[in-house]
Amino acid sequence: MSNTEFHPHIGVGLRLPHHDHFHHHRPALSWLEIHSENYFQPNSFHRQQLNQMAEHYQISCHGIGLSLGSVAGVNPQHLLRLKQLVDDLQPFLVSDHLSWSENGGHYFNDLLPLPYTEEALEVFCRNVLHVQDALKRPILIENPSSYLKYQHSTISEWQFLTEVQRRTDCRLLLDLNNVYVSAFNHGFDCQTYLEAIPAACVDEIHLAGFTIKSLEQGEIWIDTHSQPVSAEVWQLYQQWIAQHGSRHTLIEWDLDLPPVDVLLNEAKKADTLLRASLLHTNPMHPSLALG
């Protein structure tokens, strides 16, 4: 298999259990995305493997620990380790989330939502600018999945994210599964969100699966990254690229990891839709399953 089988914009998330397969078999993709924090130790076995894989794949560094929404600012040690990783790997993309996860040196095992207020906006933008100055490059900010919202928020999430981009010149990572999940949980329309986001600033798209959890009050949709991409999210992707064109597109799968072939099959679905969009054709009716 050559690394031209997939469209160059199609990639998958590289997770530690799949390391050996990608290292030895080199599936025919152009790029892989890592969780930055898993590779902060420069002499670790997995870091050495990654260095070798980086000779064959472009690498994107996707962070989960910068906690850009923290009032106290970005942890300097965390930023230093990220900078060392970025300087060594020279990834073509670096990203993190519209969220916070650290307070007073204590890290939470989740990406927590922000209140969408002017005060939070100033904090978030200050931290983004600090990181971009340290890394000497723009970073991508990903829209979150969310399960609660603050009563004192004064603007919508999409307005907040758009303003972050305007004030910091960062780029955007559009997670379509997060949009779909949050739209159900909070009762907004996906199209309202997607039409408000400045498409020209979107450099990457994430596609993943979600889980439905039943509660006494009703259902909640959770962005678990443990399922195939849903038909509805595929349809959002098809519509978005038809309107705005090709972007680097990632298949995310973090929990209940399937065999690599299953992951690559999801990537092939994205590849099919992307190539069809570039040819201005529609390979399938939205009602048809992609499985």
Swiss-Prot record:
Gene3D superfamilies linked: Divalent-metal-dependent TIM barrel enzymes (3.20.20.150)
Tell me the protein family, please. Answer: Belongs to the UPF0276 family.
What's the protein called, per UniProt?
A: UPF0276 protein VV1_0952
Source species: Vibrio vulnificus (strain CMCP6)
Identify one Pfam family in the record.
MbnB_TglH_ChrH
Which PANTHER family does this one have? UPF0276 PROTEIN HI_1600
Q: Which InterPro entries match?
A: MbnB/TglH/ChrH, Xyl_isomerase-like_sf
